[in-house]
A protein has these predicted regions:
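Rossmann-like nucleotide/phosphate-binding core characteristic of flavoprotein oxidoreductases
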Residues: 1, 17-26, 373, 384-400
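Iron-sulfur (Fe-S) cluster-binding modules
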Residues: 1-50, 277, 282, 305
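FNR/FR-type flavoprotein reductase catalytic core
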Residues: 1-15, 136-308, 312-317, 322
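Ferredoxin-reductase
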Residues: 40-147, 202-204, 215, 231-233
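C-terminal accessory/binding modules appended to enzymatic or scaffolding proteins
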Residues: 308-345
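Local cysteine-cluster metal-coordination motifs and their immediate loop/turn environment
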Residues: 342-364, 370, 377-393
Length: 400
């Protein structure tokens, strides 16, 4: 007996299949031609967390010491910033300023807890450098009501549970205290679940800014403690000398911990060999922004024949030559560009973030090896970070 296959169908199925193109065309023609104005939640969240610009306003100013002020910043709704972007303890914002003809940026670490940003307040500390360019301007001009343009929060000096130990050892001085003050505040209010042991280096006790607040936080929470290390005087409840491997081991009993470092270049130079002696895995060692080198000619590999020389830099942007600007061998190309009023995207000013990434088409630059964070391909194709590149000859630079 032959096998029989029975197919149950109808002519309507075939007819409908044939009619699909005409039905589709009719639906398209009947649809409204106005664009869909969809506001997807994921895009709204991304724009809130990572805005290209935050328009802020100074809410109040607090004198911290003879040369340090705290600025409490809030969102400037009149210019489009309704809420402040959230951040992680240890991150910074980059502030853009117009000072005379120059357009400059400076990163300032947020010293408040992220919880405070939910109440629309950032707090930054600005220490005045009498020989500086930006900090005196801020001290002299920023008052309640001053409008400020800033970036979203950036930076990698924050606790990441997939990478870091819950036991954090912080090494700092008055130039890097904001990162750890933010962490201590976050530990206190429950935003950050870590243990922080902070070694605070200073010449004298009265130079350790924010000491009273740090002591308050340490007294109220056993997950945070601070050890003051004074180099130039003896004081009660303070260590004398510098931060060393022996001193760290005296106060840290944990077998596994992360070391976070943030502060001045001299601090980095002193503690780096001490950290090496701790024999920690590299992932447990984190450095904050190193900042610009104030005396690059003092570096051992800086070309001595270039000291004191001035060169010309031809600047090109979007195919247009903006002109030739003078640049000293002992200042970064970014500083030279800003001084001439040429706006360049920059955030960290430490050779890390890559926002100022530019192409060097001719000439030579000096880049300190310890802070050269460029990709290998960038190094091969003449890509440099002007914020940490020093001219060694006349050159041509294409900026973004």
């Amino acid at each position: 007996m032959k096998n029989k296959v029975v197919v149950n169908s109808s002519f309507k199925d075939i007819k409908n299949f044939i009619n699909i193109p005409s039905l589709r065309k009719g639906v398209i023609e009947e649809a409204p031609n106005s664009p869909i104005n969809a506001n997807y939640a994921v895009n709204s969240t991304a724009n809130f967390l990572h805005p290209s610009i935050q328009y802020l306003i100074v809410k109040s100013v607090v004198d911290i010491s003879r040369d340090t002020k705290a600025y409490i910043l809030g969102p400037d709704a009149s210019l489009g910033t309704a809420k402040l972007a959230y951040f992680r303890p240890g991150q910074f914002i980059s502030v853009t300023l117009e000072i005379g003809h120059a357009v400059v940026t400076r990163p300032y670490t947020l010293c408040s807890s992220p919880l405070r940003s939910l109440d629309d307040e950032y707090v930054i500390l600005v220490k005045k450098d009498s020989n500086g360019f930006v900090s005196p301007f801020i001290h002299n001009t920023w008052v309640k009501g001053t409008k400020v343009k800033a970036s979203a929060p950036f930076g990698n000096l924050f606790y990441q549970p997939l990478r870091d130990s819950k036991n954090i050892v912080g090494l700092t001085d008055e130039y890097g205290i904001s990162s750890f003050l933010s962490m201590a505040e976050a530990i206190s209010d429950g935003t950050l679940d870590t243990d922080l042991t902070l070694f605070y280096s200073a010449r004298k006790k009265n130079e350790a800014i924010m000491m009273d607040r740090l002591n308050e936080l340490a007294s109220a929470n056993n997950k945070f403690r601070v050890i003051y290390v004074l180099s130039d005087e003896r004081a009660d409840k303070c260590e004398r000398g510098f931060i060393t491997k022996t001193l760290i081991e005296k106060y840290v009993s944990a077998t596994r911990y992360s070391v976070f470092v943030n502060g001045s270049t001299p601090l980095y130079n002193r503690v780096t060999p001490q950290i090496a002696e701790l024999k920690l895995e590299q992932k447990y060692i984190r450095y904050g922004l190193s900042g610009q080198i104030k005396n690059p000619a003092s570096l051992p590999d800086f070309p001595k024949d270039a000291v004191g020389k001035t060169f010309l830099c031809k600047v090109i942007k979007d195919g247009e030559t903006l002109g030739k600007i003078p640049c000293s061998s002992e200042e970064t190309l970014l500083v030279a560009l800003e001084r001439e009023g040429i706006a360049v995207q920059s955030v960290c000013r430490s050779g890390e973030c890559g926002f100022c990434r530019s192409k060097l088409t001719s000439g030579n630059v000096f880049i300190p090896k310890d802070v050269d964070s460029r990709r290998l391909a960038d190094s091969s194709f003449g890509i440099i970070h002007p914020c940490y590149s020093y001219p060694m000859s006349n050159l041509t630079l294409i900026i973004n």
